[in-house]
Amino acid sequence: MSPAKVDTTKKADPKAKALKAAKAVKSGQAFKKKDKKIRTKVTFHRPKTLTKPRTGKYPKISATPRNKLDHYQILKYPLTTESAMKKIEDNNTLVFIVDIRADKKKIKDAVKKMYDIQTKKVNTLIRPDGTKKAYVRLTPDYDALDVANKIGII
């Protein structure tokens, strides 16, 4: 076997290396000193480092949540007490017992969808027995007496 050839291209030429070092010294790149930071405060706060937003290995919500309150669950039944009848006649207002979780906007939307009527405003209260009562005031172009007849209250 013949002796292994020595690769001369990998080793840098000493003359070229010296010229490169001399050029660096002349330009001042090799010996630039970093200015020392003067600390004026006694306490040292560690600098903030990069915090990447964490992403989980799997989604925490498996499925989209379904709407637990639909229009039929919001309005339970209309009240037919004597005071409720007086509200229908005098104030153009219908009185409903509604789900405890329903808010005024949901009640308004449910009345609009189920009975095709526009509401002016909705007042709610929670009764001592734990149920929610809603006073639904109708707009002047709807008559509460006619709507009550259509629903079957009267």
From Swiss-Prot:
Gene3D superfamilies, sorted: 3.30.70.330
GO CC terms: cytosolic large ribosomal subunit; cytosolic ribosome; Golgi apparatus; nucleolus; plant-type cell wall; plasmodesma
Cysteine pairings via disulfide bonds: none
Superkingdom of origin organism: Eukaryota
Presence of keyword RNA-binding: yes
Pfam families per record: Ribosomal_L23, Ribosomal_L23eN
GO molecular function annotations of the record: mRNA binding; rRNA binding; structural constituent of ribosome
GO BP terms, alphabetized: response to cold; response to high light intensity; response to oxidative stress; translation
Keywords per UniProt: Ribonucleoprotein, Ribosomal protein, RNA-binding, rRNA-binding
Function: Binds to a specific region on the 26S rRNA.
Family: Belongs to the universal ribosomal protein uL23 family.
Protein name, UniProt field: Large ribosomal subunit protein uL23z
The species this protein was found in: Arabidopsis thaliana
